[in-house]
């Protein structure tokens, strides 16, 4: 079983059968422990992307309500670390990515499940450690 931190693309892929990442997500979700982590901004992004998916947003929030997905907020406690990540990576990193990298620093035994291989292969924990990733 995998202890996971979920990115937007992986979540949307799991909940939308028409999404390009559905096969990836549906293959790997059975391996993920029931308590996956994500951050609040990923929920906002996924909710927006699932707007036109029948029951997509409802199923997303059901995962939160049932405890299958634990949503963490990194602000205000981790604002200094998030700011440092955003400064380090500049325009390449958005706020959601910075939050996920910070969660990976805090929850060191979790794997980030993402479809964004381009950026997450560049990001580092503590500026030097490659992130543990599960990607397509």
State the predicted function of each range:
Residues 1-19:
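Metal-dependent nucleic-acid phosphoesterase active-site entry motif
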Residues 5-6, 24-52, 66, 71-74:
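PIN/NYN-family metal-dependent endoribonuclease catalytic core
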Residues 8, 17, 59, 64-65, ...:
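Terminal helix-to-tail segments of small alpha-helical proteins
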Residues 9-10, 41, 77, 118:
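Alpha-helix/helix-capping structural signal
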Residues 12, 44-47, 83:
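Amphipathic alpha-helical segments within well-ordered protein domains
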Residues 14-15, 49, 123:
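Residues that scaffold the ATP/ADP-binding catalytic core of kinase and kinase-like folds
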Residues 71-115:
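Active-site neighborhoods of divalent-metal-dependent phosphate/nucleic-acid chemistry enzymes
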